[in-house]
């Protein structure tokens, strides 16, 4: 059940990642398309060279191809979620902008490892398998030992016959025999062609393999607990850093737009600024999803990923409140048209 919860959660956030990626790339495509229109207008009035138009066109085509790939990725992730849950979802809740970033409690990596080694369901299953394998060895060894069986039986006979006693014949005499037996049977195995010894060796090897499985499972559980704990800790810092990076890229795009309008920044600079903002948006969203999955993975390692824990995480999600810092849509740059008497610069083709 705990593994299923994590599988569903991972597939769920994969869908959200695909949605956010598609949304960001579509926004970028729209902005780049506007930039291409503006570049074409500026080229027509002689303000820029044809290279700026070609750069914008190439960026527009690349963005369009990216959107097509994003749609395919979104459809695939939705199908994977539907495969697990058996349901098709029109809308999924996303983390709100005020989603809490909570440190693990207890805030001690070694304590989480101890809890995991004690409660991890996979490790517990491995230990039970080893115990069963050990008992099977005892059963196989018992094939060499004498055995005592208690056999009990009862027979009842009834018939009718004629009997002659001292010259007198009696017809229809009933004969009844009621017999009871209890027997102790001792069986001493002498030689069975090596069958019993082979069964013992097989059981012993299976027991050894089961014990090795416990060791391997213990190591994997410890690694999973440490990795998930560090994933939560680093995930908090990662989300905070990427949120700041998102705001910085928004500011950088505004500055680049202003520079492009007055001619101090090129169209390539503007395209790069847009790409950086789109990447920052996607990275911020993915980091938050990764943080939530790390929280659930840590709970899985500790064997505490249950319905109440899932309900608690579900309170972080919303379908109405903003899910990311406000990103202002870049203003459309109006082409600067020179006065009628201004000299027209030569266009380089």
Language model segments and positions:
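Periplasmic alpha-helical coiled-coil/stalk elements that build and connect Gram-negative outer-membrane
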Residues: 3-115, 231, 235, 255-258, ...
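Amphipathic alpha-helical coiled-coil segments
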Residues: 4-23, 34, 41, 77, ...
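A small-residue-enriched
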Residues: 6, 78, 83, 87, ...
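Residue-level recognition of short, well-ordered coil/turn positions
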Residues: 47, 121, 264-265, 304
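Short, electropositive, low-hydrophobicity segments enriched in small/polar residues
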Residues: 50, 90, 197, 267, ...
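Short beta-strand/turn micro-motifs at beta-sheet edges
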Residues: 99-103, 171-175, 220
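Acidic, low-complexity, intrinsically disordered peripheral segments
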Residues: 283-349
């Amino acid at each position: 059940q705990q593994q299923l919860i994590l599988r569903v959660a991972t597939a769920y956030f994969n869908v959200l990642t695909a949605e956010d990626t598609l949304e960001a790339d579509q926004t970028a495509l729209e902005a780049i398309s506007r930039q291409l229109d503006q570049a074409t207008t500026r080229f027509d009035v002689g303000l820029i060279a044809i290279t700026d138009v070609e750069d914008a066109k190439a960026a527009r085509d690349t963005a369009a191809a990216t959107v097509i790939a994003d749609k395919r990725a979104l459809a695939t992730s939705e199908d994977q979620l539907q495969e697990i849950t058996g349901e098709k979802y029109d809308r999924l809740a996303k983390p709100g902008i005020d989603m809490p970033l909570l440190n693990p409690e207890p805030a001690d990596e070694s304590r989480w490892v101890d809890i995991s080694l004690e409660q991890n369901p996979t490790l517990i299953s491995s230990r039970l398998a080893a115990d069963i394998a050990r008992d099977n060895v005892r059963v196989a060894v018992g094939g060499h030992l004498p055995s005592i069986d208690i056999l009990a039986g009862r027979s009842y006979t009834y018939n009718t016959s004629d009997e002659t006693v001292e010259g007198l014949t009696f017809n229809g005499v009933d004969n009844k025999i009621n017999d009871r037996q209890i027997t102790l049977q001792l069986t001493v195995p002498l030689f069975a062609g090596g069958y019993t010894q082979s069964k013992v060796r097989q059981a012993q090897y299976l027991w050894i393999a089961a014990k090795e499985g416990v060791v391997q499972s213990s190591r994997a559980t410890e690694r999973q607990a440490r990795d998930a704990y560090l994933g939560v800790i680093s995930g908090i810092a990662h989300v905070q850093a990427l949120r700041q990076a998102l705001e910085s890229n928004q500011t950088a795009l505004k500055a680049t737009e202003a520079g492009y309008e007055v001619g101090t920044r090129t169209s390539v600079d503007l395209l790069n600024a847009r790409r950086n903002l789109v990447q920052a948006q996607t990275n911020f969203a993915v980091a938050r999803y990764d943080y939530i999955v790390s929280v659930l993975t840590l709970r899985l390692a500790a064997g505490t990923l249950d319905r109440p824990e899932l309900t608690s995480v579900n309170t972080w999600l919303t379908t109405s409140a903003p899910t990311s810092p406000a990103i202002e849509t870049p203003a459309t740059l109006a082409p600067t048209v020179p006065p009628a008497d201004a000299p027209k610069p030569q266009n380089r083709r």
